Amino acid sequence: MKRSRKFSSSTTTTTVIHTFYNDHTTPPATKEIPIETPLPATKANVKTNATAAAARIQSGYRSYRIRNLYKKISSINREANRVQSIIQRQETVDAIRSDEKERLRMNETLMALLLKLDSVPGLDPTIREARRKVSRKIVGMQEILDSISETKDEIQWWNYNDLGGVDSGQGGGAWPLYWEEAVEEEMCRERGGEEMERFCAQYLGFRCFQRFLRE
């Protein structure tokens, strides 16, 4: 019978720490961070950009206001055209002649339009010119109303020669002339020169302009 032997082995690990001392002193490393100073030209560019931006904003706001003001003038002009079409009717002329309140009512309507025009600031030459043009139209209609009222008993409104007059046994009360023709004759007699030429061409039509040239 054999004997068996068991051998056991053990391993020992030793850790040796070596510390090295550096006798030479190493200076700490430094890192330089450059600081850039803006040049004066850069500051000028920033200021210029801000000024340009402000100018664009002001220009946009001005254009916005001008558009709104022009729309307001256009609205007043449309209303003036409507009143003008009413005044051109023969029944309106008859009402103005027979009723003083009707003339006052029409005058108040025209004055209200003039007040609306006065409330429009003249920020731009285009706005001022448009406002002036509509104002002249309204003032011209006021003059027509006054002429209708003031000349209701004068010969240009009755034309007795064409009717036969009182001597022929016919009373008044007829309207041989339309209001446009009567007003045109009145205006052509009162005014003259280039001013009347422009007024006739712009407001009273081609017939008045022809009459003005004949005279």
UniProtKB/Swiss-Prot annotation:
GO MF assignments: calmodulin binding; protein-folding chaperone binding
SUPFAM superfamilies to which the protein is assigned, alphabetical: BAG domain
Domain called IQ: residue spans: 50-79
Main location: mitochondrion
Subcellular location: Mitochondrion
Primary gene name: BAG5
Residue ranges of domain BAG in the record: 72-149
Matches recorded under PANTHER family: BAG DOMAIN CONTAINING PROTEIN, EXPRESSED, BAG FAMILY MOLECULAR CHAPERONE REGULATOR 5, MITOCHONDRIAL
Complex formation: Binds to the ATPase domain of HSP70/HSC70 chaperones. Interacts with HSP70-1.
InterPro entries the record matches: BAG5/6/7/8, BAG_dom_sf, BAG_domain
Protein name per Swiss-Prot or TrEMBL: BAG family molecular chaperone regulator 5, mitochondrial
Keyword Mitochondrion: yes
Keywords: Calmodulin-binding, Chaperone, Mitochondrion, Transit peptide
Induction: By calcium.
Entry GO terms, CC: mitochondrion
Keyword Mitochondrion in record: yes
SMART domains linked: BAG
